[in-house]
Amino acid sequence: MNSDHIPMHIDHEALVNLFDFVDRFPHYFIGSNADLPIVGGSILSHDHYQGGCYEFPMMRAEVAEEFELRQFPEVAGAILKWPLSVLRLSSTSREEALKAAEFIITAWRSYTDESVSVYAETNGEPHNTVTPVVRKLEDGIYEVFLALRCNITSEKHPLGIFHPHAEYHHIKKENIGLIEVMGLAVLPPRLVPELNKVQSVMEQCLANDKKANAVYGQLTTDSTTISHADWARQIYAKLLEQGDGSSKGNASLSSEQLKKYIYDEVGIVFSHVLEDAGVFKWDEEGRAAQHRFLESL
């Protein structure tokens, strides 16, 4: 605890705090939001952490690839198969795990790869940081998750290249913080009434054997749902394709079934939002760029 208000910072002291916490409460994980605008939390002026007795989806993610850090032979490295670019460090040695994490964070802060729009700084403004998470397993292994973040902007993406892109703002426009990084969608309250209206329009169109354009047309007449119109048209058409190609084939859907379908589609949008936040994409170019970063360590 600290009686002084200190701005968010990811450094040696912050990592020590995370490790101290899991040593004292090994059944809890703990993490911190990133310490830069756009990729950080909503309160950058106040140093704070978040934790709990819960296993987030990121923690269960498959290992896409393992790597070694020659400076830290006691630490096992892994690239997680996750929408964001997440490195996991594992070790029974607290000291080595902490040092390895600090080493990677320091390297990332100064790393530039223009081919994938990653810039350490522009005009003296830093862009690279991490969202760190630490937990301690029952067998005494420390796990450190480092989500690589970059808050660079562009003319095309003025809110951030690695921030939710405009086509998904109807669902999620806000920053991707610690909880979202780990796989839990924190969505704006406005979606509750808006998606209820989307569902109501889709139900009416199904009942009256309407095509997808009818959904689009109705939603564009309401200022609270116009932002969802194009997406709703797409998922309505997708729903029809899953049946017999007509709305009658899905007319028997219950209200709860339709709501679940819409919410599942929201989840798909959220996964794309997380992909937007990933600095190294899961394509050939992104994989090669990630390998270049690891080789630079």
What are the functions of these language-model segments?
Residues 1-34, 55, 76, 80-213:
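Catalytic residues for metal-mediated phosphoryl-transfer on nucleic acids/nucleotides
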Residues 7-8, 37-42, 60:
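Short, well-ordered, mixed-charge alpha-helical segments that flank or form enzyme active sites
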Residues 39-56, 145:
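Histidine-centered divalent-metal-coordination microenvironment in nucleic-acid enzymes
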Residues 39-43, 99, 294-296:
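Short, solvent-exposed polar/charged micro-motifs at secondary-structure junctions
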Residues 43, 62, 91-93:
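Solvent-exposed, flexible loop/coil residues
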Residues 47-49, 63, 69, 80-83:
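Cation-handling catalytic/transport regions enriched in His/Asp/Glu
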Residues 52-73:
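Helical (often loop-to-helix) elements that flank the catalytic cores of nucleotide-handling enzymes
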Residues 140-297:
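Sequence termini and other peripheral, non-core segments
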